[in-house]
UniProtKB/Swiss-Prot annotation:
HAMAP family: EF_Ts. Belongs to the EF-Ts family. This is Elongation factor Ts. It is found in: Cytoplasm. NCBIfam families: tsf. It comes from Photorhabdus laumondii subsp. laumondii (strain DSM 15139 / CIP 105565 / TT01). Residues 82-85 are annotated as: Involved in Mg(2+) ion dislocation from EF-Tu. Its main location: cytoplasm. Coiled coil: none annotated. GO terms for molecular function: translation elongation factor activity. Keywords: Cytoplasm, Elongation factor, Protein biosynthesis. The keyword Repeat does not apply. One of its GO terms (cellular component) is cytoplasm.
């Protein structure tokens, strides 16, 4: 298993739901390329789908707010090491001060923001006893902006046109729950579509269908694929009988962009017990 680490096997298991030995074998055959291993597992039927890379491990809070003029909004992620500190009054107050500065000075660059608060961050680390990090900031500008916070762990910022406050809130809640990656199916990048098309074509061809029929089957699957990962193509969580696109059309509204943050996404946490499990299985 040279070059195939326990962490890599674990990530493949989490993203595909497949067993350990299947994941180990797939990674060996793909020379450690996890994306290639996922594609091969999907083609062979070992994995029906794959979760997006990025395991949630870090603690902290998400802040979401729109400036008083309603035309500038921001999301900020502030990380700490434990859930206990994430609820600490001093930690939360620091986050609110960071957000207030982002809105007042319209800061969109994370390094600029970090530099502005480095002295206060260092002092807070010394006081609380945990590492604290202003991890990221994203902003949107527009005529109609809205936010939604699910607890303090998921935050959404939406820019829309022709929508009222309630509609924007409902759409933001949907985004928090359903995790769309794009606004419209047509926004899905060509390379993402091409990759999925090839996977679906290989699956269809393996069933013994002629290429012409396989292509027709794949066409329908691709419409479903782009719809499922785009906001307007998803079934609305509050009324699954319609899509979010239908909802917006009924209200003569459009969503121009959105940002979704979840605490710790993409930050890896070492788990030594899993390494022991792999070692035991390889004996």
């Amino acid at each position: 298993m040279s070059g195939i680490t326990a962490a890599l096997v674990k990530e493949l298991r989490e993203r595909t739901g497949a067993g350990m030995m299947e994941c180990k074998k797939a990674l060996v055959e793909a020379n450690g390329d996890i994306e290639l291993a996922i594609d091969n597992m999907r083609k062979s039927g070992q994995a029906k789908a794959a979760k997006k890379a990025g395991r949630v491990a870090a603690e902290g809070i998400i802040l979401a707010e729109v400036a008083a003029d309603g035309k500038f909004g921001a999301l900020v992620e502030l990380n700490c090491e434990t859930d206990f500190v994430a609820k600490d009054a001093g930690f939360i107050a620091f986050g609110k001060e960071v957000m207030a500065t982002v809105l007042a000075d319209k800061i969109s660059d994370i390094e600029t923001l970090k530099a502005k608060f480095e002295e206060q961050r260092t002092a807070l680390v010394a006081k609380i006893g945990e590492n604290i990090n202003i991890r990221r900031v994203s902003v949107l500008e527009g005529e109609q902006l809205g936010t939604y916070l699910h607890g303090a762990r998921i935050g959404v910022l939406v820019a829309a046109e022709g929508a009222n406050e309630e509609l924007i809130k409902h759409v933001a809640m949907h985004i928090a729950a359903s995790k769309p990656e794009y606004v419209n199916p047509s926004d899905v990048p060509a390379d993402v579509v091409d990759r999925e098309h090839q996977i679906q074509l290989d699956i269809a061809m393996q069933s013994g269908k002629p290429r012409e029929i396989a292509e027709k089957m794949v066409s329908g699957r691709m419409n479903k694929f782009t719809g499922e990962i785009s906001l307007t193509g998803q079934n609305f969580v509050m009324d699954p009988s319609k899509t979010v696109g239908d909802l917006l059309k009924e209200n003569n509204a459009t969503v121009t962009s959105f940002i979704r943050y979840e605490v710790g996404e993409g930050i890896e946490k070492v788990e030594t017990d899993f390494a022991a499990e792999v070692a035991a299985m390889s004996k």
